[in-house]
Amino acid sequence: MSYFPWLTILVVLPIFAGSLIFFLPHRGNKIVRWYTISICLLEFLLMTYAFCYHFQLEDPLIQLKEDYKWIDIFDFHWRLGIDGLSLGSILLTGFITTLATLAAWPVTRNSRLFYFLMLAMYSGQIGLFSSRDLLLFFIMWELELIPVYLLLSMWGGKRRLYSATKFILYTAGGSIFFLIGVLGMGLYGYGSNELGLDLERLINQSYPATLEILLYFGFLIAYAVKLPIIPLHTWLPDTHGEAHYSTCMLLAGILLKMGAYGLIRINMELLPHAHYLFSPWLVIIGAIQIIYAASTSLGQRNFKKRIAYSSISHMGFIIIGIGSITNIGLNGAILQILSHGFIGATLFFLAGTASDRMRLVYLEELGGISIPMPKIFTMFSSFSMASLALPGMSGFVAELVVFFGLITSPKFLLMPKMLITFVMAIGMILTPIYLLSMLRQMFYGYKLFNVPNANFVDSGPRELFILICIFLPVIGIGIYPDFVLSLSIDRVEALVSNYYPK
């Protein structure tokens, strides 16, 4: 047992080191860039070391626990700990943030603030995935919003203020329900004179049926905004259409996954009876979302928005996996969280770099750019294939495991299972249609248009490095998913066994 405060260091290091950026000498952006990338790398290496040497995969309990009294007056503790559910998400956060920092190399305007906000976001995300106290979870959830809002409103497209305001209104609106749920849970357990927010205690807490359903619904609204679940998804295409591509990488790669993580960590673990009641609805919503977002994506002219809708469609698989209440389904949802984290982030990075070079985002104005930009074309095609679940890539394995999870679920009858599977299959047919038509309109054809001031430069070594770094895990998970599944499999088994008592 290691008593070294690994997780506290992992949570606090980025934001503290980030605040020192403002004291660096004003000699261009070079120092700031190298400083930020080295902080991200150091954090990622520390994380990998701590998990390799101090985390036992076979143990389904919480590990690397830390508990420090913080605010004595209402018994608020700084409680951290990780298990198989959060391990993959934390590693994904470290990986994507490091590459997003490298992707933000061309940012020169207010670069100190930009990099500080990215590091602040990093701290918030790792704090969220490792917190073991409900109030701390909520604080980290909120801490995330401020950097994202500033990154959107200061570095973005023409309508950036509109999309940033829309984002903050949606997420803050969802957070109100979250806070009510947190207070309701804390006050119910310990009478009205003190709050009990320790997740370990709350797991064994039982609630009256009506209260549990109300709490579940409150949390669900907050996660439905983040995840996003239709009809609370409309902030996402606007945000992705306007944000700088390194911000998009963090949004698609990590921010959306926080909603899925909260759904598993709080709704499934702490409110099992309500989740058992709501799970058929989750599966139905997930299936509708896959088809709805895929068909909406087909009608988008802006290719960034088209990729944003494909993100929403892929989140449907996570919702179905969580709603299936089976070992296989939940493992599939966790696999899809990681798989889409890699694929979604890269597609936005590619879309951003391509639109920066061409200064165009509408598909009908594009065509024939595969000739001047063969590397971007190759990588765009490869990641589109990964997104449409080509066998041998991570998207295929994740969706297949979710399928099996739904089919083997003892909770649903045969007819509903067949119906949902049929709907999912239609969604999987629509995915290649909108992705391949986007590729055709962008890269094929003869319109080597004469755009003034467009510099058709193919991707340089820095961009290729980012793309190859993400391509390797996508292929790796596709060929040998067991490595990722072994992180969460024991924890998931312990969680699902609560639903089907022996």
Swiss-Prot record:
The catalysed reaction is: a plastoquinone + NADH + (n+1) H(+)(in) = a plastoquinol + NAD(+) + n H(+)(out); a plastoquinone + NADPH + (n+1) H(+)(in) = a plastoquinol + NADP(+) + n H(+)(out)
- UniProt subcellular location: Plastid, Chloroplast thylakoid membrane
Topology within the bilayer: Multi-pass membrane protein
InterPro entries in alphabetical order = NADH_Q_OxRdtase_chain4 (IPR022997), NADH_Q_OxRdtase_chainM/4 (IPR010227), NADH_UbQ_OxRdtase (IPR003918), ND/Mrp_TM (IPR001750)
Which GO molecular-function terms appear in the entry? NADH dehydrogenase (ubiquinone) activity; ubiquinone binding
Q: Which GO terms describe its cellular component?
A: chloroplast thylakoid membrane
Membrane-spanning ranges: 4-24, 37-57, 87-107, 113-130, 134-154, 167-187, 213-233, 244-264, 274-294, 315-335, 336-356, 388-408, 419-439, 464-484
Q: What's its top-level EC category?
A: translocase
Name the HAMAP family for this protein. NDH1_NuoM
PANTHER family in the cross-refs:
NAD(P)H-QUINONE OXIDOREDUCTASE CHAIN 4, CHLOROPLASTIC, NADH-UBIQUINONE OXIDOREDUCTASE CHAIN 4
Which family does this protein fall into? Answer: Belongs to the complex I subunit 4 family.
Q: What is this protein called?
A: NAD(P)H-quinone oxidoreductase chain 4, chloroplastic
Q: State the species of origin.
A: Lolium perenne
Q: Which gene encodes it?
A: ndhD
